[in-house]
């Protein structure tokens, strides 16, 4: 049997996929949830990206895990997940009130329609050592304090592995580590990270540490076990997901 000719420019190399995007709908939900008129779609999407960047910069140091945005016709809700909610809320809720005002000002500056009902929810992350975003910031914080990078990643990965539900972790640093003239990468890994398994609950985050001799890139993967679907209840239209015990 004659085989079809192979194209010369055919690219059979594998592609790198973000672990979060790889599990959308299966295990993860979108961080921006809304429907919009086609004419307003670009405005809303651009607004979400710019507001999220603004908040990530403004709230750096507050151990933020994620920023979620929900919109309806009359209401807009921001959900900020953090391991230290007290830093955001402040005394008698003054910090949360000020942050709410700042978000509305930013929306006005971006020419986004002011919602009739605006809500800001601050949710506590109960297991921060199992959250990749918080762990990545902890590493960046240690590096920016001029601590030895090997000690930082070794100490933190041991903390991560003792956290509830964690079965594997991987940390990669890249840049002029220790002030070296030539940039390189350093990696440390514990347990397993099954990136190709859809049911594997893998959290991932990129972060930067700004040092006097340059920027060090940080990548963190945390494997929190597999998630299996329960049997579908005929009375329920949705399928609930529960962690494998």
Name each model feature, range by range.
Residues 2-245:
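RNA-contacting regions in translation and RNA-metabolism proteins
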């Amino acid at each position: 049997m004659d085989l079809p000719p192979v194209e010369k420019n055919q690219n059979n190399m594998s592609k790198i996929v973000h672990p979060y995007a790889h599990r959308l709908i299966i295990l993860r939900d979108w961080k921006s949830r809304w429907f919009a008129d086609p004419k307003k779609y670009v405005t809303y999407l651009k607004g979400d990206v710019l507001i999220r960047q603004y908040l990530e910069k403004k709230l750096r140091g507050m151990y933020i895990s994620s920023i979620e945005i929900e919109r309806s016709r009359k209401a807009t809700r921001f959900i900020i997940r953090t391991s230290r909610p007290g830093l955001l809320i402040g005394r008698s809720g003054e910090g949360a009130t000020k942050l709410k005002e700042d978000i509305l000002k930013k929306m006005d500056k971006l020419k986004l329609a002011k919602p009739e009902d605006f809500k800001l929810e601050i949710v506590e992350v109960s297991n921060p050592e199992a959250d990749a975003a918080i762990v990545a910031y902890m590493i960046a914080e240690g590096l920016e304090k001029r601590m030895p990078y090997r000690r930082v990643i070794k100490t933190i990965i041991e903390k991560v592995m003792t956290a509830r539900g964690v079965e594997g972790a991987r940390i990669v640093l890249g840049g002029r580590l220790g002030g070296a003239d030539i940039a390189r990468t350093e990696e440390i890994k514990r347990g397993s990270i099954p990136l190709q398994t859809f049911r594997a609950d893998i959290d991932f985050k990129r972060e930067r540490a700004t040092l006097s001799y340059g920027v060090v890139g940080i990548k963190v993967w945390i494997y929190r076990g597999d998630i299996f679907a329960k049997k579908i209840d005929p009375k329920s239209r949705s399928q609930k997901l529960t962690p494998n015990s």
